[in-house]
Swiss-Prot record:
Record organism: Bdellovibrio bacteriovorus (strain ATCC 15356 / DSM 50701 / NCIMB 9529 / HD100)
Protein's recorded name: ATP-dependent zinc metalloprotease FtsH 1
Enzyme Commission no: 3.4.24.-
Catalytic center residues: 426
Gene: ftsH1
Cofactor dependency: Zn(2+)
Assembly and interaction partners: Homohexamer.
SUPFAM superfamilies hit by this protein: FtsH protease domain-like, P-loop containing nucleoside triphosphate hydrolases
UniProt-annotated location(s): Cell inner membrane
Parts of the chain on the Cytoplasmic side: 1-6, 132-645
Cofactor: binding comment: Binds 1 zinc ion per subunit.
Amino acid sequence: MRSTQKTLALWFFLIIMAVFLFQAYESKQQKAIADFNFSKFTEAVKAGEVATVTFRQDTSEVVGEMKPEFEKKYNGTHFSIVGNTQDEGYKFLQQHGITPNYERADNGGFFQSLLVNWLPLILIVAMFLFIMRQIQAGGGKAMSFGKSRARLLTEHKNRVTFKEVAGVDEAKEDLQEIVSFLKDPKKYTKLGGRIPKGVLLVGSPGTGKTLLARAVAGEAGVPFFTISGSDFVEMFVGVGASRVRDLFEQGKKNAPCLIFIDEIDAVGRHRGAGMGGGHDEREQTLNQLLVEMDGFESSEGVIMIAATNRPDVLDPALLRPGRFDRRVIVNKPDLKGREQILAVHMRKTPLGPDVDASKIARGTPGFSGADLENLVNEAALVAARSDKKYLEMEDFEKAKDKVTMGAERRSMVISDEDKKVTAYHEAGHTLVGKKLVGLDPIHKVTIIPRGMALGVTQTLPEKESVSLSKSKAENMIAFLFGGRAAEELIFKDITTGAGNDIERATEIARRMVCEWGMSKLGPLAYETRDNPVFMGMGYGNKSKEYSDAKAQEIDTEVEKIIKHGYDISIQILRDHQDALERLTQALLEYETIDGHEVDMLVNGAAVAEIEKYRNAKKDSNAAIMNAAEKKGSGDPVGNTGPVTI
């Protein structure tokens, strides 16, 4: 602290001195008359413009001062010339009313000249040398651009353990092995094994890569440095490489240790792919990183962990064994993983007895860990707005709808005719989805506008699916055309409401023909995806490797698949038009119906039965809540322990 204060005081003194001397020098230069010679002096004396004159003995120098009213004329007040100091000069001045003064030459002139003319230059040189010394001195000093910005995490600061990481069991196992090696290296080295130099975490955004790295830091018990890939590159040339060197120097001093680089694609992109050739700053930084990880001087005991969601743009030299020996794929969680993640986040929230984590997990396919955390938080906000003591299943449903489909737009003005068209459209989707085999069950249908949609038919998968059969793909196309088919069947006209449905159906049909081999053209891939790296970015371009004649055949097959799906939708709606009417009337009356209510209507129940069912369900839920609260002595339900699955 004292050295810092001394440095600041020295800087302050030097700056004040430099400003003062510069102003004094400028002030003197501005008052001195430029280009003033002896002839101009005599003319000024004759004109009565000179106030004082001084002859300096032992020299031929004459100095003086003009009258103030003539300062603007001469752009100054003081003058200095080489003139005649004999009697003639004295008499000349006397004749014009000026009595000259005499003084000996100032012996301190040299020092004054040195102070005014040379001291500013000396100060500038001294400041430059001081700055260069500060740069070489290292961390904490001024202008230390080349020092690493890595942060050292302590054991007790934001400590995360593997117990708080769920849904990525395989990734946890790989990283737990790294932690085990750091704690007991002899267990592996006695069999000839060596510690991996680097671990690359690859996965979509929000899957928990950074959380895994924090868990490693919490479990390992060794120094853990963390830095972002963007922290290396600055506007100054050579800063990135210098920071890499400094980072590994810190790591070697604290070995064994872990270094975590988040978003490494910011510095590790493919060389030669962008503008600037092989000499741009990012490539110099990458070259230094490659050398530090596995060059002539090995970094024993320093384990690198990096995270990225763009492995396709990373330089191959960075991915080879010896640098990143292990690549850990962090996928989006499956059904079981989503249940585990929900359980972790639900521990912090009071839950009602009707909350079913497995049902929520089934209704959130494709959600990442971050999405699920946001879902639980959104449900808590929904419950808080209703002044509830605990979260109910209804709150999670509202939160999921808001996250997946957008907020309700109840203020949107919709005419009765448009509302009726939307109701028939969604009822058409629903009825086709119920009658076709193999599709996911209908979970909810609504005609309340959400996001960009006027209505939504939501399905809920019963199980995780890793592949798609031909029959299910064809049924999905028919399901997508259910809304358009209902419009044509009822109104004898069609609207733009099916635009997104048609786009999705066409994509499925084209992929069936060109990628999946599900047509008469056979199991051939007519379109391959290219991923060239251009300017550090991969573009998923499709290359067409077929003739124009084959393109015509492909279009024909796609049209057949689309027509077949549309015909199926029309036929189902014609055969069950009474059920279509019941679904439509229920949507117009209640705006939203759930999966059980859909089953009732499709199986022949009247619309009036929906109200009876809802009242019975409401009474049942109230009884369950009252019983649970009495059992828990009024405490929030679900707040007494961890969520069980």
